[in-house]
């Protein structure tokens, strides 16, 4: 604990001095500063695995309601609550709603870390993440449906309403894992099964008759529109062709290539309607970039590939423009605040047919921790990007201001994702 407190004090001193000099890093020896960032990221890695991850399900959960050992995730819904779809069929507000988003992000992060360090144990760690994703794909018996998460109490109860965001991160992460040296042939077989099942579900359900909804696990349309995969907003248009493209890439089957090519150009045209002034949350830019990354890497037509690269560059610019403000918001937030027991929420809101418990002031804390990481990550996903010194400095300051042992937001995963992406590209050093 003394070492942690020492690291925190040094971090605060460095941040104060950086602030006095307008963000310049000449006030500190750069290798020492890099070592401080590296140490804090190592701590974040331990916290993610020890507090947010549950071996029973193989999943990472959304927030901590306590820092007391063994009580961090005590707020998660019981099997009885999940079985009756309480408080709502998405599990909104429960801390069990973003398992596939977090799982996909962790797969990608581990792939990047391995590219930097070559650590042998990462093969076992990424296999743990994959087991959780496989559980979400299979435990309910509905082919191609990706559950948001699984109830820890019984290890099999799920909420029946997923979303295009869950599918986006899940497929992207599996695709990156598939192409990583960490992935052995038996696992590749399993990934092909999961991605092709998702694509088959899209082929069967995403039709005009269903208003292009991928449907809930019970076969009904999602009343919120969050499972609609086509005729969507510009930032959502590339999700469907990305899924088909990934399925075609890992299986080689033409039945996926045809819809991939059918939707690709319309998706590009719709994506080009995004504007710098659109008031998007940070997660939008991450998911857009995930979709473009797959499509860009697989594209063989030079003209189309150039259009996709331009879209990635625009997405990078939009995210980068918000990074500094996200850092400032983070610096003013109570970053040690824990999340609530959602059952005791003072306010509940109606969202379509669903009732959602609200987190009150904690929502802002959870949100700004996550956004700081997401906005730092997006520009680093652009192929061949030139990252300005200010963006690198912002990322370092975000990491250094955090006490990850007192962090209750799953946004910690995006801090790790941005850091290891930067390390992979040689933009940050360990010391």
Where do the language-model regions lie?
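Bacterial N-terminal signal peptides
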Residues: 11-21
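Terminal, non-catalytic domain-edge segments
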Residues: 29-54, 183-184, 294-431
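Low-complexity, Ser/Thr/Pro/Gly-enriched N-terminal "stalk/linker" regions
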Residues: 28-98, 128, 132-149, 186-189, ...
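Carbohydrate-binding/catalytic loop surfaces
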Residues: 59-93, 142-163, 211-232, 277-300, ...
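Extended, well-ordered alpha-helical scaffold segments
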Residues: 32-48, 120-136, 173, 182-206, ...
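Aromatic- and glycine-enriched pocket-lining scaffold segments that form the walls
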Residues: 162-243
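Bacterial N-terminal signal peptides that target proteins for export
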Residues: 2-13
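Long, repeat-rich segments with strong aromatic
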Residues: 236-307
């Amino acid at each position: 604990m003394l070492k942690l407190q020492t690291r925190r004090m040094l971090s605060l001193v460095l941040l104060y001095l950086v602030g006095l000099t307008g963000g310049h890093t000449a006030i500190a020896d750069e290798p020492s500063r890099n070592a401080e960032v590296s140490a804090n990221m190592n701590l974040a890695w331990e916290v993610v695995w020890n507090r947010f991850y549950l071996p029973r399900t193989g999943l990472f959960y959304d927030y901590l309601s306590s820092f007391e050992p063994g009580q961090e995730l005590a707020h998660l819904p019981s099997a009885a609550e999940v079985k009756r779809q309480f408080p709502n069929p998405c599990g909104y507000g429960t801390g069990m709603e973003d398992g596939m988003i977090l799982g996909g992000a962790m797969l990608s992060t581990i792939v990047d870390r391995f590219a930097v360090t070559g650590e042998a144990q990462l093969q076992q760690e990424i296999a743990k993440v994959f087991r959780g994703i496989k559980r979400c794909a299979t435990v309910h018996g509905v082919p191609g449906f990706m559950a948001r998460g699984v109830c820890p109490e019984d290890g099999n109860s799920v909420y029946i309403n997923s979303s295009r965001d869950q599918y986006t991160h899940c497929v992207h992460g599996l695709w990156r894992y598939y192409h990583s040296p960490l992935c052995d042939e038996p696992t590749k077989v399993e990934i092909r099964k999961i991605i092709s099942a998702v694509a088959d579900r899209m082929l069967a359900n995403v039709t005009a008759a269903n208003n292009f909804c991928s449907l809930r696990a019970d076969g009904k349309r999602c009343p919120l529109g969050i499972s609609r995969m086509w005729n969507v907003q510009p930032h959502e248009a590339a999700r469907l062709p990305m899924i088909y493209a990934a399925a075609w890439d890992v299986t080689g089957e033409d039945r996926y290539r045809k819809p991939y090519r059918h939707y690709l150009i319309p998706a590009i045209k719709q994506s080009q309607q995004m504007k710098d002034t659109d008031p998007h949350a940070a997660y939008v830019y991450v998911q857009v970039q995930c979709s473009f990354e797959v499509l860009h890497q697989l594209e063989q037509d030079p003209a189309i590939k150039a259009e996709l690269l331009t879209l990635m560059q625009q997405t990078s610019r939009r995210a980068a423009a918000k990074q500094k403000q996200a850092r400032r918001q983070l610096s003013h937030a109570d970053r040690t605040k824990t999340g609530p027991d959602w059952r005791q929420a003072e306010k509940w809101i109606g969202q379509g047919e669903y009732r959602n418990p609200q987190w009150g002031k904690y929502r802002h804390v959870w949100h700004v921790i996550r956004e700081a990481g997401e906005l730092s990550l997006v520009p680093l996903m652009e192929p061949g990007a030139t990252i300005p010194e200010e963006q690198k400095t912002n990322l370092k300051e975000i990491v250094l201001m955090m006490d990850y042992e007192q962090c209750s937001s799953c946004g910690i995963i995006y801090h790790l994702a941005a850091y290891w992406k930067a390390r992979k590209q040689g933009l940050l050093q360990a010391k």
